[in-house]
Amino acid sequence: MDISFYTGAGGGVWSLEECARWAKAHDFDAIRLSAGGVADPETVLREGPDEINDTLKAHGLYLAGLAAHNNLLDDDPEKRDAAASRLHKAIEAASRLGTPAVITHAGSPVGFRFYGGYSAPPGNPSDRSTELVGRFKERFTPIVKLAEEKGVKIALDVAVRMGNIACNPQMWERVLDAVPSDSLGLSCDPSHWLWMMILPPEDAIRAFAGKWYYADVKDCEVSREMLFRQGIIGNWWWQYRVPGRGQLNWGTIIGALLESGYDYVLCVENEDHGLPGLAGIDLGGRHLRQFLPKKGEPYDRPPGFWKVE
């Protein structure tokens, strides 16, 4: 496994050259770019991949993936068509860039309330999960076919609060079954599972062995005192942290990923209010590195996946 981080470059943030120079100086192997700025898909398709690839290669880095979050499940047909067009271009741009992964999300028109009212049984009048899985199949089938043709894998983000039906094991099964393809999988980010109580995270990883196509890694901290004071409807009883500043066991998580067949990047994502910016990304990368085999040393993976049945 390599270590990467998520950032934008160009378009008002730091330049790709500045980004690459910092990444190399802080022992990163790769970066993941958002589909904007220097990595805007229309720019890449019009001008080609050389500016990005040559700049990264000059610093001994590579592009780990392209982030293109677009809500293809919006209730407004025009908005979901526009989102599909943007994702289509991002997949074509990723193929031109030679990066194997596009990270997106399944989307949702109702935020995280797609199951309907709390404590209401499945199929209640406000439960839209079945409808939205059907919409996912309709909207993502041509997108996944394009990814197959272009040799790109789509990794679905597992975050929930952005509005995303693919946010828990039940819905991962449903969307992956709806569009079965080796080009559609998941992006591992166990920070969400801690506060959602999808625990232990290593069992969630092993249950979907072979379907982790990317690993967006954050940590999380739950305050039991604030949970007592606010209950789950509060807004401050959990916080995202960079790896090493939260409550997740990264040695165990990385072991589960390796045992589940994942051998690509660990991509640091910084939403840590207590250590924002590059300082947090640097700490996260250093914390993760200690759990990996030394560079150049192969990992002797056991035969077959260790999968929860």
Could you tell me what each predicted segment is?
Residues 277-298:
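C-terminal helical cap(s) of enzyme catalytic domains, especially alpha/beta-barrels
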Residues 12-23, 81-91, 196-205, 250-253:
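Short, acidic/polar
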Residues 30-31, 63-66, 133, 137-247, ...:
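Acidic/histidine-rich catalytic cores of soluble enzymes
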Residues 17, 50, 54-62, 74-185, ...:
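Active-site acidic/histidine proton-transfer and metal-coordination neighborhood
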Residues 32-53, 109-113:
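Glycine-rich, proline-tolerant flexible connector loops at the mouths of alpha/beta enzymes
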Residues 16-36, 97-101:
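Catalytic domains of carbohydrate-active enzymes, especially glycoside hydrolases
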Residues 6-10, 34-36, 68-71, 107-109, ...:
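Active-site beta-loop-alpha junctions enriched in small/polar residues
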Residues 23, 31, 56, 83, ...:
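Conserved, mostly hydrophobic/aromatic
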